[in-house]
From Swiss-Prot:
Binds 1 Mg(2+) ion per subunit. One of its GO terms (biological process) is UDP-N-acetylglucosamine biosynthetic process. It comes from Geobacillus kaustophilus (strain HTA426). The modification Phosphoserine is found at residue 100. Catalyzes the conversion of glucosamine-6-phosphate to glucosamine-1-phosphate. The lineage of its organism: Bacteria, Bacillati, Bacillota, Bacilli, Bacillales. The gene is glmM. The keyword Phosphoprotein applies. It catalyses: alpha-D-glucosamine 1-phosphate = D-glucosamine 6-phosphate. This is Phosphoglucosamine mutase. InterPro entries: A-D-PHexomutase_a/b/a-I, A-D-PHexomutase_a/b/a-I/II/III, A-D-PHexomutase_a/b/a-II, A-D-PHexomutase_a/b/a-III, A-D-PHexomutase_C, A-D-PHexomutase_C_sf, A-D-PHexomutase_CS, Alpha-D-phosphohexomutase_SF.
Length: 449
């Protein structure tokens, strides 16, 4: 991670850390790095519903125009919508203004290259070096050399038309679908998409006012949708996050269906229809043990990566896999889009329900989730804690006792002085006992008083 770019673009409190002055520089320098080989480069910009989106969009646009780029404003649209349109419209770059599931005061800036994928570490480092350069040596066109800005709000409809082509069913008639749009980027798009497929749509979390994004709604608060599904008698509930790159579902009984379960359902269907490349699914180390056991029972292989959808995508690109994702609901169908896509995932899930004629509770119930417990221990040195002999010893002892019927994962936090201890076992009691046993040793050996 660099000075400005984290694991998912540039993020910070809008107008304090992520200022319009910085956004102007990011637009100018980022635009230059991504478009320097084009004579009249085209850059797309989309945003979620945060109040700060207009301010940052204006600054980014000014920076881009100042290097001679042509800017197309997409308005409110999902992150995967920007990724798809960047490639589909032949743009040199796409930019999304969003902080995803973060609180409203935060915002972020995320770039996509001409292929629709997020930037490489090298490209981000080049942009950062230009931002921090003592002297601005970038082009300063004048007159007709300056860029122009145009609105392309129909981009959202172009994206929805594309999404509809990815499913086998003609429509979802006869199905009642409850949507929770997190008062975010999918608020208009998702409702239109499913209504256009003749579903009976009921919607919550679709009244953005600039301040209520993710507030008690969306994929990080699926309990709100669970109650809504039962109240409305819906067949399925679909919860998106603020920028629309995640999906968490709810079955007809009000049970939450997470990313692992959704991936399992999709992997099984793709294998049955001969479309699962290399019979393999890519997930992160945080996926549930029950997920791997369910895949194994279907003859499906799995590959694990570090936590973060960018690592999942890297692995998929490198080895030619077409399905991957995270328990949190970032699910990537690489045949159709270059990033996690909540609406695309929702379509695939409902498509499978309709084709199989089975309720979501039955489809998701094929995967038995192991109880999972995560405990954080504050330590003086998280890296040294991982090398401590007593810590290593207790982890080995616990793994031996589990004997394949459980799993333990001990790793340093990426952002805080913490060691995260996660265990899965056949019962919650066993889970707690294993986690506390390891946590006690970590506290004793490396903990902060």
């Amino acid at each position: 991670m660099g000075k400005y770019f984290g694991t998912d673009g540039v993020r910070g409190v809008a107008n304090r850390e992520l200022t319009p002055e910085l956004a102007f520089q990011i637009g100018r320098c980022g635009g230059y790095v991504l478009t320097k080989s084009a004579e009249r480069p085209k850059v797309l910009i989309g945003r979620d519903t945060r109040i700060s989106g207009h301010m940052l969009e204006g600054a980014l646009v000014a920076g881009l125009l100042s290097i001679g780029a042509e800017v197309m404003r997409l308005g409110v649209i999902s992150t995967p919508g920007v990724a798809y349109l960047t490639k589909a419209l032949g743009a040199q770059a796409g930019i999304m203004i969003s902080a995803s599931h973060n609180p409203v005061q935060d915002n972020g800036i995320k770039f996509f290259g001409p292929d629709g994928f997020k930037l490489s570490d090298e490209q981000e480092a080049e942009i950062e070096a230009l931002i921090d350069s003592a002297e601005d040596m970038l082009p300063r066109p004048i007159g007709a050399g300056l860029g122009q800005v145009n609105d392309y709000f129909e981009g959202g409809q172009k994206y929805l038309q594309y999404l509809k082509q990815t499913i086998d069913e003609e429509d979802f008639s006869g199905m009642k679908i409850a949507l929770d749009c997190a008062h975010g980027a999918t608020s208009s798009l998702a409702t239109y998409l499913f209504a256009d497929l003749d579903a009976d749509v009921v919607t919550m979390g679709a009244s953005p006012n600039g301040l209520n994004i993710n507030e008690g709604v969306g994929s990080t608060h699926p309990e709100a949708l669970a109650a809504f599904v039962k109240e409305k008698g819906a067949d399925v509930g679909l919860a998106f996050d603020g920028d629309g790159d995640r999906l968490i579902a709810v079955d007809e009984r009000g049970n939450i269906v997470d990313g692992d379960q959704i991936m399992y359902i999709c992997a099984k269907y793709l294998k049955e229809t001969g479309r699962l490349k290399q019979q393999t699914v890519v997930s992160t180390v945080m996926s549930n043990l029950g997920f791997y056991k369910a895949l194994e029972a279907q003859g499906i292989k799995s590959v694990q990566t570090a936590v973060g959808d960018r690592y999942v995508v890297e692995e998929m690109k490198k080895n030619g896999y077409n399905l991957g994702g995270e328990q949190s609901g970032h699910i990537i169908f690489l045949d159709y889009n270059t990033t996690g896509d909540g609406m695309l995932t929702a379509l695939q899930l409902v498509n499978i329900m309709k084709i199989k004629g089975k309720p979501l509770s039955e489809l998701a119930g094929e995967m038995k989730k192991y109880p999972q417990l995560l405990v954080n221990v504050r330590v003086a040195d998280k890296e040294k804690a991982m090398e401590n002999e007593q810590v290593k010893k207790v982890i080995q002892e616990v793994e031996a006792e589990m004997n394949g019927n459980g799993r333990v994962l001990v790793r340093p936090s990426g952002t805080e002085p913490l060691v995260r201890i996660m265990a899965e076992a056949q019962t919650e009691e066993a889970c707690r006992a294993y986690v506390e046993r390891i946590a006690d040793v970590v506290r004793r050996e490396m903990g902060v008083e």
